[in-house]
Curated annotation (Swiss-Prot):
InterPro entries with a match to the protein in the record: IS66_C, P-loop_NTPase, Transposase-related, Transposase_IS66_central, Transposase_TnpC_homeodom, Znf_dom_IS66
Entry coiled-coil feature ranges: none
PANTHER family per the UniProt record, alphabetical: BLL1576 PROTEIN
Superkingdom per UniProt: Bacteria
Region: Disordered, residue numbers: 59-79
Record flagged with keyword S-adenosyl-L-methionine: no
Keywords: Plasmid
Stored NCBIfam families: transpos_IS66 (NF033517)
Keyword Transcription: no
Source taxonomy: Bacteria, Pseudomonadati, Pseudomonadota, Alphaproteobacteria, Hyphomicrobiales
Naturally occurring in which organism (per UniProt): Sinorhizobium fredii (strain NBRC 101917 / NGR234)
Protein name: Uncharacterized protein y4jD
Name of one Pfam family that matches: LZ_Tnp_IS66
Amino acid sequence: MSLRHEQLPQDVEQLSRMVLDLRAEVAYLKRLIHGARSEVLSTIDPTQTSLDLGDLSTVPVAANDDQPDGSRQSVRGRQSAARNIGFLPKHLPRYDVIIEPESRACACCSGALHRIGETTSEALDIVPAILRVKRTIRPRYACRACENGVMQAPAPARFMDGGMATTALAAHIVVSKFAWHLPLYRQAQIFAGYGITLDRGTLGIWGTRVAWWLKPLYDRLLAFIRSQPRVFSDETRLPRLDPGRKRTKVCQLWAQAVDDRPWKGPAPPAVGYIFSESRSAREAERQLASFNGVLQVDGYTAYKTLARHRGKSNSSPLRLAFCLAHARRKFVDVVKLTGSPEALEIVSILAEVYQIEREIRGQSAEDRQNARQLRSAPVMRQLKARLLDLKNDISTQSALAKAIKYTLAHWTGLNAFLDDGTIEVDSNIVERSMKSVALTRKNSMFVGNVQGGETFAVLASLINSAKLSGLDPYAWLADVLERIVSGSTTINQLETLLPWNWKADQVGQAA
């Protein structure tokens, strides 16, 4: 909202604060559009008030969200480059190239040489993908003694009537897009390099058909996730074409995930995506109607509305656990934009919490809870006291004040992890699952229609859940798709094909 000259405050100090706040807001918006979003901080001079960050030291003092286990490093040193040192993996097949000397005769006496040993070296080799045509031949047999004795084996099931792709090729196309983020137009270019023209529209039709076959398995995946006592949830945009308009319509891809590995719980890791045209609280209620337990989320209003409605209706209980990383990120932004020593102090306090989390990761839920009560709870009390002190001393319109207001407004949910060792300190588990979606979306740009969005959700859910289970996504999908299409696995046996139950009996061990 713009202010007229006569509406501006007369106090010079207040005007200066407004200018600094506006400059910080502009810098923040520019960084959202053009800048990196890493949360690695540099040491900042507490006396610095300028937005010029060019003189910052390079010693990190806070962490980002990119640790594989969701933990943070309070101090990050220079890491050596990762290299393959030693022997190549034993599970890779070997082939031998034997190089004999030009002559096996002794150079001194011309006598025959005998083998006394060998020198072996290994080098990694690759055999590029080979396209081939699978010919299915069904001989017909007839009886010479009668006219009605013709016999022929029935035609095998095909994953698509009239299609010219095998289940293996269809699996390759799907995995290339959703696991390795190769858009269909690039895959079409790769196939052209092999000498065959495949339109990307054809590839898309094959992917849609794969999703059709896998839909019952996807439904079981979502049912499993929602049956757990703790679920992480998040959402991200997924543009789709909107005929008649000059721009795409912004739809949503919701994610729900489970992962008990931080406390060695029984549930296998899994993630399910749901395509929707809405981001409303009603949509959240529709998706989570059957869920009751702990829902770990960011501060999005729809989740708070959902929990409030559940509380009023006395229906299945829902407890919200909020993400401490989201609260911390707001203070990190303030430090980066204004160099605020107060914000840096808050980040440093939060770093203590994450250091404790790093140390207790992998312990039992009981041990985690005890450690949190003993060590983390005092830190969180210290944090709240400091936030309340700062709240009374700074401009209510400043970026720091807004970060403090957000944190205090979500305080109960941010402390949920203290009383339950099975609750995580943040929702980074589900946020990491969004990185794969973001890469696929960046390369593919949009989905063509609602069916395309639903196909995206089905395939991304199963492929990423397979990766979370440590499987080779292609080996899993090719085998599962063939079993479903051929009918060797019935509808009542689909549970055995979920990634954590799958046995690679026919295709070798999973990666």
